UniProtKB/Swiss-Prot annotation:
Name of the protein in question: DNA mismatch repair protein MutL
Family to which this protein belongs: Belongs to the DNA mismatch repair MutL/HexB family.
Phylogenetic placement of the source organism: Bacteria, Pseudomonadati, Spirochaetota, Spirochaetia, Spirochaetales
GO molecular function, one term: ATP hydrolysis activity
CC terms in the record's Gene Ontology section: mismatch repair complex
Length: 612
């Protein structure tokens, strides 16, 4: 007796339907694709009970003719392709001819459509079989009504989540379609209540409309570029809005959401200079690629894609993001450098022309070289460590008094001895009007400003100030008196480290490979003195990231060790210095990606106690 048998036709259809349709959001995705492919510029979605009870979609697209309506629900019927070579130039979202037939098998399906704006026709299909076909009053476009999902698939229905979770999944699909088609009006109603409305707008505005709440309505950064056969647009959140998972890394290829590991890693790699391994960016990558170079026909729900002859793509994504943040960082560091120099000149002007000095002289120019030596020792007794580089020209109408300390010496004393700078901290450049209300839990600084209360993490803030100074300082190669030998345990780490030896030299770090998995550290930057172990530990845990992460991670670690800690009690003068730096530099996040502060408005506070 034969063991191999032909399956019943209805069973074959159920198996096929189970591959394409696994929950309500799958149906919503397929129906939205059909509406978009029809050329509609207005689409409305109605969901009941997370789509399990009902999914209704209306559009004003080209519609379905009477003849096509009679066969559209049958397996492998499609208007998108005609022959095999059409698979190489797919421009539409749908193309397999499986969606409507799968939906018709596992639910009750009713379609009403018109191509003329006059007579329309309606077909109802139950369990894959036509129930009726009739003429209806005129409509403009198409209405698709799906009810009682999986009523004949009890096993599949048991695996559905509760309504609220299925609703969230449907909302995710709706947002993905809305964000990739900004030229279409979208509306979404949940249980007869209008919840989402998006009107026609530009892509950046649509991204802001759909995902802006994630970053508290701050503005997304934008990169737009074009290569041969590829158009690339990248939108990303400010780095202080990082996440602990990858859920907000989204990739859209030819207006389809796809899951592509190499591109996701490229986005993470592009943010590696500003985010740590424990944090992930909020980033949306939009790619438009000639259909000849991509293949979507490898996944039942078209979530995966295969590229042809585009090996440069991940590297370009990473490089574009890196270059953007490089420019941003240089601007921030230059602002920081200018503020430091300007504050010193302003605060210490009384050393050069005291008010009580009647002496007058001709206009003179002085050139002052500041801090040739780099000071990085742990501050003791609430001392501050700051590093000031370069030369500045100072103009004065009075000469320096001989019985007063030099300008350079006085600056060094100010920066290193907190106990002697109470008055100077009260006179910074661009002094912000704020009220320092004290230290909370020996961890937070409480500040009142413009009807808002700020709770500032003292360690994160001080850490960021030191980090920005370190990253902007001049580095000099310092040869170790006795080279340090170390080993790496992993072969992959060995290969990565060996391939990057020349790159480390650009950071004034010289490391030599002695034998397999054995290296020797010979030189380091002068600012890393006493931190050889930090560098070696970094080598031992090296992963496939850009070389710039070494500089970022290393200086973040040093800054972390130098900064005041949680449970440190600090003086009021030092606190106010940190606070003024916070407002001057507009600092939002520490080198490790954590938020530096939390704020609450007077209105919010009053509202919480029912005063508003």
């Amino acid at each position: 007796m034969n063991k191999i048998k032909f399956l019943d036709r209805s069973l074959v259809q159920k198996i096929a339907a189970g591959e394409a349709i696994d929950r309500p959001c799958s149906i919503l995705r397929e129906l939205l694709d059909n509406s978009i492919d029809s050329g509609a510029d207005k689409i409305e979605v109605f969901l009941e009970e997370g789509g399990i009870r009902r999914i209704l979609i209306t559009d004003n697209g080209s519609g379905i003719s009477k003849e096509d309506l009679k066969i559209c629900y049958l397996p492998h019927t499609t208007s998108k392709i005609n022959e095999e070579k059409d698979l190489e130039k797919i421009q539409t979202l749908g193309f397999r001819g499986e969606a409507l037939s799968s939906i018709a098998i596992c639910s009750n399906l009713t379609i009403t459509s018109s191509t003329t704006g006059e007579d329309s026709y309606q077909i109802e299909v139950e369990n894959g079989t036509e129930k009726y076909f009739k003429k209806q009053s005129a409509i403009n476009g198409t209405i698709v009504d799906v009810t009682n999902l999986f009523h004949n698939f009890p096993a599949r229905k048991r695996f559905l989540k509760k309504d609220s979770i299925e609703t969230k999944m449907c909302l995710k699909v709706f947002e993905e379609k809305a964000v990739t088609h900004p030229g279409i009006d979208f509306k979404l109603s949940l249980n007869n209540e209008l919840r989402k409305v998006y009107f026609k707008e530009s892509l950046i505005n649509r991204v802001q409309s759909v995902y802006g709440e994630i970053i508290e309505n701050n503005k997304f950064g934008k990169i737009e570029t074009e290569y041969e056969n590829v158009q690339m647009k990248i939108f990303f959140a400010p780095p202080n809005f990082s996440r602990k998972d990858r859920r907000n890394i989204k990739i859209f290829l030819n207006r389809r959401p796809v899951e592509e590991h190499n591109l996701s890693e490229a986005i993470i790699d592009g943010h590696s200079r500003i985010l740590t391994n424990r944090n992930f960016p909020i980033c949306y990558l939009f790619l438009e690629i000639d259909p000849r170079y991509v293949d979507f026909n490898i996944h039942p729900q078209k979530k995966e894609v295969r590229f042809f002859n585009l090996p440069f793509l991940p590297k370009q994504v990473s490089s574009n993001i890196n270059e953007f943040f490089d420019r941003e960082r240089k601007e921030i560091l230059q602002d920081y450098h200018n503020i430091i120099i300007k504050r010193q000149i302003t605060n210490d002007a009384h050393l050069l022309h005291p008010e009580d000095d009647p002496t007058n002289s001709d206009f003179q120019t002085y050139e002052i070289i500041q801090n040739e030596s780099l000071i990085l020792d742990k501050p003791q007794n609430n001392k501050i460590t700051n590093i000031i580089e370069d030369k500045v020209k100072f103009e004065s109408q009075n000469p320096i008094q001989k019985d007063k300390p030099s300008f350079k010496s006085y600056i060094q004393n100010i920066l290193l001895e907190t106990s002697t700078i109470a008055n100077d901290f009260q006179k910074p450049i661009a002094k912000h009007e704020f009220k320092y209300r004290g230290q909370l839990f020996s961890e937070f600084l409480i500040v009142e400003k413009d009807n808002e209360v700020f709770f500032i993490d003292q360690h994160a803030l001080h850490e960021k100030i030191i980090y920005q100074t370190l990253i902007n300082s001049e580095k000099i190669t310092q040869k170790l008196l006795i080279p340090i030998e170390f080993q790496v345990d992993c072969e992959d780490t060995d290969k990565i480290l060996a391939s990057e030896l020349e790159e480390y030299k650009k950071l004034d770090i010289i490391v030599t490979k002695i034998k397999e998995q054995t290296y020797q550290l010979e030189s380091i930057p002068n600012i890393c003195n006493k931190y050889e172990n930090v560098i070696i530990q970094f080598f031992k845990t090296r992963k496939s990231k850009t070389i710039d992460s070494l500089e970022t991670d290393l200086y973040a670690t040093i800054a972390c060790r130098q900064a005041v800690k949680c449970n440190d009690t600090i003086s009021s003068e030092f606190s106010q210095f940190l606070i003024n730096e916070f407002f001057n530099l507009k600092l939002k996040y520490c080198p490790h990606g954590r938020k530096i502060y939390h704020k609450i408005s007077k209105f919010e506070l009053e509202k919480s106690v029912n005063r508003k």
